[in-house]
Amino acid sequence: MIEKLQVIEEKYLELEKKISDPEIINNNQEWQKLMKEHSNLQPIVEKFREYKRIIKTIEEAEELLDTNLDEDFEKLVKEELNQAKEQKEIVERELKILLLPKDPNDEKNVIMEIRAGAGGEEAALFAAELFRMYSRYAERKNWKVEVMSTSESDLDGFKEVIFMISGKGAYSRLKYESGVHRVQRVPVTESGGRIHTSTATVAVLPEVEDVEVEIREEDLEIETFRAGGAGGQHVNKTESAVRITHKPTGIVVSCQDERSQHANRDRAMKILRARLYDYYQSLQQKEIESQRRSQVGTGDRSERIRTYNFPQGRVTDHRIGLTLYKLEQVLDGDLDEIIDALITHFQTERLKEVG
């Protein structure tokens, strides 16, 4: 690991010289590329330099302990040595995590799809609450939320809502939200006061550039129809709504929220592109995932990943056994504690895999 880190530091110093070179500064495209590479290496180099400082502290303390010291000073040096050794272990782990191969999608924007599952109207209301939760989380992160497609229920819930969240590192923070979310509470539609269980599914897809997925025109079946809101209100007189079917995979996307057929087609294509990318990625991953399955579960979308229990004010993430008694704050977008714990857990799993 140390040799690898030394090579990275040399590369970083070389890049530092290049980005200060007036000739390269004048070539904006080249300069931007080198700056990006430089900023990607910076956290690794800074952590490596911290590691080297700790090693120096340990060596100096051990040298001191080999000399004749008075009792009080020796005690101080031993304390410093123990602290430095503990810190060395922590920083070593952080370096291993920084050296893990990056998920190429981590910096991308995300397309999120929330669908009401079991539980009828109550599930649709829960889907709307999840949408609000992610929107509030995006606000806290200064990310932008854009609704792409909705299908409302009679009580202002969502049978389905598709939206994009744009911002730095959006996918890296939200990718672990894919799965079945479960709610336990007394529904507004329940007169007997009994607690019901309902579900909603969440899919998190990275936004995909045109070049990343090839979509052939002949593979698409594009239909237009009249748009209509929930319960048939706001019915459009023109055929502005668009339904696109990708014939080889059978994936279907409909969009009717925009006023023009052209805008709905653009949105539908953006969603289709993300779904196809996810579909092909999933095919590649299936074989790898089958080997990875262990006591932590498959990470499959069909798995129940989290429960929101209203009577107890409790949120439990079943993948990592984390329970928080702050349901209200979580539903208001206070998700960092859960997301940080998930990131730490899955990074640890990856460290075990790479040995």
Curated annotation (Swiss-Prot):
Its main location: cytoplasm. It is found in: Cytoplasm. GO terms for molecular function: translation release factor activity, codon specific. Keywords: Cytoplasm, Methylation, Protein biosynthesis. Methylated by PrmC. Methylation increases the termination efficiency of RF1. The keyword Cytoplasm applies. It comes from the Bacteria. It holds the Pfam family RF-1. This is Peptide chain release factor 1.
